[in-house]
Amino acid sequence: MASILQAIRYSHGKLAIIDQLQLPYVEKFITIRTSEDAWHAIKEMRVRGAPAIAIVAALALASELNTLIIHDKLSSRAEEVKLFIREKLDYLVSSRPTAVNLSDAARKLESTISGHADTPGATGRTVAEAFIRAAEEMMTKDLDDNMKIGQNGAEWIIKHALARHKSTATVLTHCNTGSLATSGYGTALGVIRSLASKKALEHAYCTETRPYNQGSRLTAFELVHDRLPATLITDSMVAALLASTKAEVDAIVVGADRVAANGDTANKIGTYGLAVLAKYHGVKFLVAAPLTTIDLGTKSGEDIVIEERPSAEVTKIRGPVDGDHPADIVKLETVHIAAKGIDVWNPAFDVTPSTLIDGIITEVGVIEKEADGQFHLERLFIDNSAS
């Protein structure tokens, strides 16, 4: 397996992200200097993936604060800087409301700086520096959590999903949950990477993931980058794949943008359909997500707000012009692929009921349903003193 792709670059208050709208054709990094830059990058999906947008939002504000410190433009009053940070965090959260990681990160960062601002002798600079440290630690922790998620998921699949005659797993994944969606390594794609590192990966399948094609553009890009045995399929081919005795898919592993208290999971549109197919074909269906994605304040999937995206994402598609051109020059064009005038419904996510989920892979282990047939996710936070 080749080196893991790095999509977020941060050092000493300077942040750059790979522009995912250009992938897989052009690997271009864009500089993020302010919270406004981050808001637009998230809204325009230049960066996406629940963990990644939380990290980019936090580091963008850290970069902005660092610049204000360097140029001596930061208020000396702790209370004013606290309010400035709070307003910026609220603004950043509005860029992608479905992803709980973003609001969770904002809440934790706000708590950190509020506590610091209330300490004797606090100044505007010390409050800003406390925020910067917390944002940087968030990125480090996310990468560590992803490695643990990958390890836990791989071990569970080897133990519970493989038929007796098999020693390697064939896994299907949806959307993009790798280095491009996190600080690095990934959640669901991290599980596939961990299987490969254990020499326990037979094959990986990734769905195209219409309408935004995160699977064909991004996951396929990562799988090729890592030189993993993989095949791209369209979303409508999944049923045929699971029915195929030749493919022998052992597990479907997906990520999550929000997991409700009862285990209902909001993820990229199409996930619900995969879970239904997995249940029918007897294939294990797993959700891979850090504890920060679990929202105990949301009782069930019925309470999750589903973001709706522009109709143009369904009726148009963007890609390079076919033909001869220098390797370093790629001309991207947008073309219509639907009849003009047709109405479009474009929800970005759907909700998979917990009844269809076999396990939720986290950094502290794989959570399964208990004797009553229910997930009891609240116990995770009691056992791990998380909030």
Swiss-Prot record:
This entry's Gene Ontology molecular function terms read: S-methyl-5-thioribose-1-phosphate isomerase activity
Native organism = Aspergillus fumigatus (strain ATCC MYA-4609 / CBS 101355 / FGSC A1100 / Af293) (Neosartorya fumigata)
Q: Which reactions are catalysed by this chain?
A: 5-(methylsulfanyl)-alpha-D-ribose 1-phosphate = 5-(methylsulfanyl)-D-ribulose 1-phosphate
User: What is its subcellular localisation?
Assistant: Cytoplasm; Nucleus
Gene responsible for this protein = mri1
- Give EC number(s), comma-separated: 5.3.1.23
First-level EC class: isomerase
Segment forming the signal sequence: none
**Annotated InterPro entries:** IF-2B-related, IF-M1Pi, IF_2B-like_C, Initiation_fac_2B_a/b/d, M1Pi_N, NagB/RpiA_transferase-like
Top-level taxon of the source organism: Eukaryota
What is the protein name for this chain? Methylthioribose-1-phosphate isomerase
Q: For this chain's UniProt record, which GO biological process terms are given?
A: L-methionine salvage from methylthioadenosine
Q: Which UniProt keywords apply?
A: Amino-acid biosynthesis, Cytoplasm, Isomerase, Methionine biosynthesis, Nucleus
Q: In which pathway does it act?
A: Amino-acid biosynthesis; L-methionine biosynthesis via salvage pathway; L-methionine from S-methyl-5-thio-alpha-D-ribose 1-phosphate: step 1/6
- Which Pfam families does the entry link to? IF-2B
Q: Which family does it belong to?
A: Belongs to the eIF-2B alpha/beta/delta subunits family. MtnA subfamily.
Kindly list the residues the record flags as site (Transition state stabilizer).
175
